[in-house]
């Protein structure tokens, strides 16, 4: 599992582009919020997270993306 961690003020392109490419490659990828069900990036774009950090089991993480 690949987790893309989203904190308020994240760089949108650094989150969306890798997520898209990883999913196209067939890797299970989840957007993970550090601050609630939605997170706003540095340019005011809001994304809905697949999971909140409290729901994540990092022991099965193959990769972490930190935008």
For each predicted feature, which ranges?
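Extended, subdomain-level signal for the structured scaffold at the beginning of enzyme domains
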Residues: 1-67
């Amino acid at each position: 599992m690949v987790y893309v961690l989203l904190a308020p003020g994240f760089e949108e392109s650094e989150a969306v582009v890798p997520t898209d490419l990883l999913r196209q490659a067939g890797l299970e990828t989840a957007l993970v919020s550090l601050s609630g069900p939605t997170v706003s990036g540095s340019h005011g774009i809001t994304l809905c997270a697949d999971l909140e950090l409290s729901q994540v089991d990092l022991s099965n993480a193959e990769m972490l993306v930190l935008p």
